[in-house]
Amino acid sequence: MIESYSDSFVAMKKFAETYAKRTNTFFCNDLSITQIVLEGLAKHKDEYGAPLCPCRHYDDKSEEVASTYWNCPCVPMRERKECHCMLFLTKDNEFAGSSQTL
């Protein structure tokens, strides 16, 4: 991964690594997907103050941030280990890599 990123990107990367280890999930075997998702989370963190899931469409992003449902880690991820963005994958997922670090 490229090393010159914003503070928010670095924070999201650290969060993702910690969360993957804690939940025993793995990053996608195509790390370009992981990078794009982290960039989207960092952008939303900068713009809205929270890491809103970048892989969904929202009519009102500020309203979604306030509801917290789709803030990463989203409710489906926390409850069922279902990550729509493919950032956190269970080891039985065909797209899961073997890494929990970036």
Curated annotation (Swiss-Prot):
GO cellular component terms listed in the entry, alphabetical order: chloroplast
EC number: 1.8.7.2
Residues given in the record as [4Fe-4S] cluster binding sites: 53, 72, 74, 83
A Pfam family matched in the record: FeThRed_B
Disulfide bridge positions per record: 55-85
Reaction catalyzed: [thioredoxin]-disulfide + 2 reduced [2Fe-2S]-[ferredoxin] + 2 H(+) = [thioredoxin]-dithiol + 2 oxidized [2Fe-2S]-[ferredoxin]
Location relative to the cell: Plastid, Chloroplast
GO molecular-function terms, A-Z: 4 iron, 4 sulfur cluster binding; electron transfer activity; metal ion binding; oxidoreductase activity, acting on iron-sulfur proteins as donors
Free-text cofactor note: Binds 1 [4Fe-4S] cluster.
Cofactor: [4Fe-4S] cluster
Keyword field: 4Fe-4S, Chloroplast, Disulfide bond, Iron, Iron-sulfur, Metal-binding, Oxidoreductase, Plastid, Redox-active center
Residues at the active site: 55
Signal sequence, start to end: none
Site (described: Increases the nucleophilicity of the active site Cys): 84
Top-level taxon: Eukaryota
Biological role: Catalytic subunit of the ferredoxin-thioredoxin reductase (FTR), which catalyzes the two-electron reduction of thioredoxins by the electrons provided by reduced ferredoxin.
Subunit and partners: Heterodimer of subunit A (variable subunit) and subunit B (catalytic subunit). Heterodimeric FTR forms a complex with ferredoxin and thioredoxin.
Listed PANTHER family: FERREDOXIN-THIOREDOXIN REDUCTASE CATALYTIC CHAIN, CHLOROPLASTIC (PTHR35113:SF1)
Family named by the database record: Belongs to the ferredoxin thioredoxin reductase beta subunit family.
Protein name: Ferredoxin-thioredoxin reductase, catalytic chain
Source organism: Guillardia theta
Top-level taxonomy: Eukaryota, Cryptophyceae, Pyrenomonadales, Geminigeraceae, Guillardia
Gene name of the encoded protein: ftrB
